[in-house]
Structures are given as structure tokens and as C-alpha cells.
């Protein structure tokens, strides 16, 4: 596997499309819209697919199809393990699972999703050696934890990033990060959430021993219960984000938009 240091996860996806010359791809409805925008921009035909309530894909795909599958909230490594044995052209979006093993023909993560002092950057693992004429990102910044407004501003900046190699600032911050410490901290916080919320969580999932989730995903019994929990968390200084854009209520996945509370490890 080649490791490529790029400036964002979405540009990792762009790199993959270019590297393999992908013209058609399967993408789930339940996913950040930036990924479909990348595919559209690169001229890919997109076939959208549904997922079940355990996050596994509903359909059976053509054997040699290119498939983008997200490791949702970092709790879906067992599903990834099954898919990679069936589909030779699986692409794994590990934006929510930095510590996951490389899988499929390519997989990528997102530094800023896991390390609050890092603003951008992503690692791409790809089984094809290619050479693109791209520049190194020159973005520089002072590392600090961002408030909500600054996070939104940074998101808008990332939306407009050209595909470039990771900036020196981001690379240095990443290399100076104690990955073992961050891993242990996340697992500890996740376990604390488990003790409090597992009995009432409508999501049924079992982690692999090495899984390090992005957050604690809590599926409330009703939309009203979810709203109450979000309000309570906000009153305690915890910002909760919706994942992702609203989708039609007739879709299975709409339950996640309406009732899933992604509790951050802050």
C-alpha cells in the first residue's frame, strides 16, 4: 500500500477517482454531500444505495463495481471486513475511523476529525502507485481548539481546497501527536458513554477490540427524546452536529438524521 499525505479527505477521494479512472461508483445516500460533489465534479456516474439500520448496505453490488463505504462513526469495521472479502474494488471512507486498518483498493482518514489541534489533512492508503503533478498546500495556522464559529469557517475553507499534498504545518503537528495517548483517551471516553447510555441506546453494535470510534452514536427511541438529549448536552457545553443532510422520511436512513445523537469526545 502506498501512503499519500493530502490536504483533505475529500481530496483523497478525488485522488482515488483519478488514479483508477473511475467512471461509475456506488455511494450511500447517508453520507456527507461533499463526497457526491467530488464524484460529480470528476465526471462519475453515481449509483446511490441504501443502508440498513446496522449501517450495512442493503443491495448486493455487481462484483467488480467501485463502491464507497463509510466506516460510520468508527463502529463498522466488522462490516468492512465482510465487504472487502466480496468486492475487489471497495473504497473505505475512514474519516470516522482514523485508527482502522487499511482496507480495499484504497482507504482514507481525516486528521481534523480526530485531533482537535489539527485543521486539515488526511492520509490516503492506495494499492496503486501513481504520480500526479500537484503542489504542497502552504496553509499555516496556530494550533488550538476551535469554537463553533471557527469550525464552520474552517469547513468552508476546506470545501474550496484544491487537491494538494499536506501542508508542512499539518504534517509537523501530526507527527508530533501522541497517537497512543489519543487512542487510549478516546477509548476511555467511549467506555464511559457506554456505561451511561447503552441500556437505552436503540443502536445494536459490537466493536472489534482495536476499534477507536469517532464518537458515541446514540439512537434515541423517538425524535422528541433525541431533541431533549441534544438540548441537555448543549446546556452542558457540548455541541452536537447532525449527520448529514436531511433525506426523505420514506428512506430507512432518515431515522439517523432525526434520532441519532453523535456524542463527541470533547
Predicted regions and their residues:
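PLP-dependent aminotransferase class I/II
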Residues: 31, 50-51, 68, 134-266
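Active-site PLP-lysine loop of aminotransferase-like
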Residues: 73, 108-120, 128-141, 266
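Conserved active-site segment immediately N-terminal to the catalytic lysine
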Residues: 89-125
Amino acid at each position: 500500500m502506498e501512503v499519500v499525505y493530502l490536504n483533505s479527505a475529500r481530496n483523497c477521494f478525488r485522488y482515488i477517482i483519478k488514479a483508477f479512472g473511475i467512471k461509475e461508483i456506488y455511494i450511500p445516500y447517508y453520507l456527507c454531500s461533499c463526497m457526491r460533489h467530488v464524484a460529480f465534479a470528476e465526471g462519475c456516474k453515481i449509483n446511490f444505495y441504501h443502508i440498513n439500520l446496522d449501517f450495512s448496505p442493503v443491495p448486493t453490488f455487481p462484483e467488480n463495481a467501485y463502491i464507497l463505504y463509510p466506516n460510520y462513526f468508527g463502529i463498522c469495521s466488522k462490516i468492512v471486513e465482510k465487504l472487502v472479502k466480496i468486492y475487489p474494488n471497495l473504497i473505505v471512507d475512514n474519516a470516522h475511523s482514523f485508527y482502522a486498518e487499511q482496507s480495499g483498493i484504497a482507504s482514507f482518514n481525516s486528521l481534523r476529525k480526530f485531533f482537535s489541534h489539527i485543521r486539515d489533512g488526511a492520509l490516503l492508503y492506495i494499492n496503486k502507485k501513481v504520480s500526479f503533478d500537484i503542489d504542497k498546500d502552504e496553509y499555516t495556522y496556530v494550533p488550538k481548539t476551535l469554537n463553533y464559529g471557527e469550525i464552520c469557517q474552517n469547513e468552508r475553507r476546506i470545501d474550496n481546497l484544491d487537491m494538494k499534498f499536506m501542508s508542512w504545518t499539518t504534517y509537523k503537528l501530526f507527527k508530533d501527536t501522541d497517537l497512543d495517548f489519543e487512542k487510549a483517551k478516546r477509548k476511555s471516553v467511549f467506555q464511559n458513554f457506554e456505561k451511561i447510555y447503552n441500556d437505552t441506546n436503540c443502536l445494536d453494535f459490537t466493536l472489534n477490540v482495536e476499534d477507536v470510534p469517532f464518537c458515541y452514536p446514540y439512537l434515541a427511541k423517538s425524535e422528541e427524546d433525541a431533541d431533549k438529549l441534544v438540548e441537555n448536552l448543549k446546556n452542558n457545553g457540548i455541541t452536537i452536529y447532525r449527520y448529514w443532510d436531511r433525506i426523505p422520511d420514506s428512506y430507512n436512513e432518515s431515522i439517523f438524521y432525526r434520532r441519532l445523537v453523535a456524542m463527541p469526545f470533547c
